[in-house]
Amino acid sequence: MPELPEVEVTRMGIASHLKDRRIVGVLVRDGRLRRPVNEDLAELLVGQRIQALERRGKYLLLHLDQGQLLLHLGMSGSLRVLPRHTPLRTHDHVDIYLDHDQVLRFHDPRRFGLVLWGSNWFADPLLAKLGPEPFDSCFNGAYLFRRSRGRQQPVKGFLMDNQTVVGVGNIYANESLFRSGIDPRRAAGRISLARYELLARTVVTVLQEAIAQGGTTLRDFTHPDGESGYFRLSLLAYGRAGQSCQYCGNCLREVRLAGRSTVYCPHCQH
DNA sequence: ACACGATCCTGACTGC
DNA sequence: TGCAGTCAGGATCGTG
């Protein structure tokens, strides 16, 4: 489900409900995630107060008095703040009970997500190797150009690599390359500085638009408040294989790149 | 170092 | 209706 915009929409939706709340209980119904949830999570968390909810790439960091709870939504995860006695759905794997009768509930059918306690996640290999945030000034065309020299990898895979830049998954990689007129199959090392400058600006614009529209709702992604994200209506490439290009009217084509569905316009993208 | 495929897991959907 | 096959927004690991 979530790329950077969906994670950021989640963060914005729940951060104010979490700030200064005290954790009064924890229930792990199924701790078998990408890595096992800490077995003693309740002992570790109960009594601590929540200071902030921060995002780094597609990771969320819940800052508590004595450390941080690292959260990742994987492909199918979601995180909501609910009244404590809200009925359970299947795959509601972790509940963190808060004062004021609320619960922070982690839901993840495919269990590719993470819920892990630690004291310094920024030093952990999971986060330490991440590339820049797309909204940071060091993410720009010159950076992409420099980093891509000599690389034969298709530019789409290069853009989705979270050591290049964090947060750009399959949907937004497709959209950014479409809007930039760059063929996703083109070798990353053979794209000009000028085109990378356009691509970097486009990535930022696409992600910002998606956040402003509440993210992209496919299948079950909804806001923390249950609303849908409307960026799906703005998708020009992703999910539109076989339909006509909004720019030139030709038929959009689909190929698989690094195992991921890739949609592009053979006429507009080079 | 680099690029790719397989893999973790469940659910939705397709076609027979 | 049922069953097999395919695919899905991520990230890591092993391979050549």
Q: Each PLM stretch: what is its role?
A:
Residues 1-270:
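Structured catalytic/nucleic-acid-binding cores of DNA maintenance enzymes
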